Amino acid sequence: MDKHTTRLRRARKTRARIADLKMVRLCVFRSNNHIYAQVISAEGDKVLAQASTLEAEVRGSLKSGSNVEAAAIVGKRIAEKAKAAGVEKVAFDRSGFQYHGRVKALAEAARENGLSF
């Protein structure tokens, strides 16, 4: 198995566990150039809030969308948008990525700004 297939297998297992909990989930996707975060309803059919380094407000203030500082800004924005949508508690779905670097920075920034998981 290659790295990509292994990551997808881990993500599938995690999402199955979160689906059993019937909780709203904070889903993170990391590409080489950007980072994306979505708050998805417990049923999995609606996106309640989203933030990424592609947003105009975020993009203008960053030199690069693929570093820890950019991830922290996205974490702060997703927490603010989730709270505005009435979401306080989420399950963290790291999409099979290691809890390290950009993924960790996004999660910690979201926690500091009011999301609990």
Swiss-Prot record:
GO terms for molecular function: 5S rRNA binding; structural constituent of ribosome. The keyword Lipoprotein does not apply. One of its GO terms (biological process) is translation. It comes from the Bacteria. Keywords: Ribonucleoprotein, Ribosomal protein, RNA-binding, rRNA-binding. GO terms for cellular component: cytosolic large ribosomal subunit. CDD domains: Ribosomal_L18_L5e (cd00432). PANTHER family: 39S RIBOSOMAL PROTEIN L18, MITOCHONDRIAL (PTHR12899), LARGE RIBOSOMAL SUBUNIT PROTEIN UL18M (PTHR12899:SF3). Belongs to the universal ribosomal protein uL18 family. HAMAP family: Ribosomal_uL18_B (MF_01337_B). NCBIfam families: L18_bact. This is one of the proteins that bind and probably mediate the attachment of the 5S RNA into the large ribosomal subunit, where it forms part of the central protuberance. Part of the 50S ribosomal subunit; part of the 5S rRNA/L5/L18/L25 subcomplex. Contacts the 5S and 23S rRNAs. This is Large ribosomal subunit protein uL18. The lineage of its organism: Bacteria, Pseudomonadati, Pseudomonadota, Betaproteobacteria, Neisseriales.
